[in-house]
Amino acid sequence: WTYDAQGNKVSYVNNFSDVSESGFGGYICEGRQLGETYMYKVYRGSGEGYTGGAVDIHAGPKDGMIRTKEDMVWVQAMIDSGYSFGGMKTLAKDQLWYGDILYADSNGDMNYGDTNDRDFSGHTSVPKFNLGFNCAFSYKNIDFSMLWSGAFGHYLNWNTDYYNSTLVSHGYGIIEHIANNHYFYDPSNPDDPRTNQSGKYPRLTYGTTYNNRIQSDWNEYKADYFKLKNIQIGYTLPQRISSKFFVSKLRAFVSMDNILTITSYPGLDPEIGTAIGYPLMRQISFGGQITF
């Protein structure tokens, strides 16, 4: 029997000095990682709420979502003290309401989540290194090979309408994980069986002014993956048999592509990114090889 194994690791190195080369299609900023994302950050408070007197700007919802009456009281106290959220100072279903996400006031201008609050995330959409490994074995007339590949050290912001967004629209469906686990609370009917104040995703919205769909770290996911890209198994007929067909080698094989993906990324496929496209298909093919 025989075997062969090869691997490769390609790391990318950040350039924190002058930019002297072109060719990258994303953002390039001196002193920042290549492809570092620039986005809103979700507000995260202590959850203590408003207890009277001067409002504590750090006492809001722990995960940034308005979930309870106490959260709403704190938001109203903030508005009464001159703060705004995405430019809004009104609590209403078609504006800022239960199940909405609050964004951080990164620049301290008392407007939480306006366009000036975007900041570098410290994460990049460009993998820090790519890994590949292939090996092949053969025993007598049987051969076997496989190819693995992976990418590590990057993040993807998956916030695509109708795939990972709580926006609803006529004629479009809602993806299952959001349909089954979105926030719902009607203060006029707290006993509504649909109530789900611990929902993982924001409330479903249609035509509201407040925006839960902006690019933020709420929808940022670690996109590391390791894939079994190909397996091939073959069998070569003994030469004493193949010679009867006037060929020196006759080999049959089965090849399987995109067999396994190991990842925590919840989107379609971390290899194709956040774009909406058909994911890489799992394929099985059969073939033959003839050498005269």
Name each model feature, range by range.
Residues 81-85, 95-98, 151-246, 250-251, ...:
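Extracytoplasmic gating/loop element in the C-terminal half of outer-membrane beta-barrel translocons
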Residues 1-121, 183-189:
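Conserved small-residue
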Residues 141-144, 240-241, 284:
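Repeated loop/turn-to-beta-strand initiation elements of outer-membrane beta-barrel proteins
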Residues 235, 280-292:
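Outer-membrane beta-barrel "beta-signal"
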Residues 1, 139-141, 150-154, 230, ...:
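Transmembrane beta-strands of outer-membrane beta-barrel pores
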Residues 1-3, 7-17, 161-171, 267-275:
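Flexible, surface-exposed loop regions and adjacent strand-edge segments
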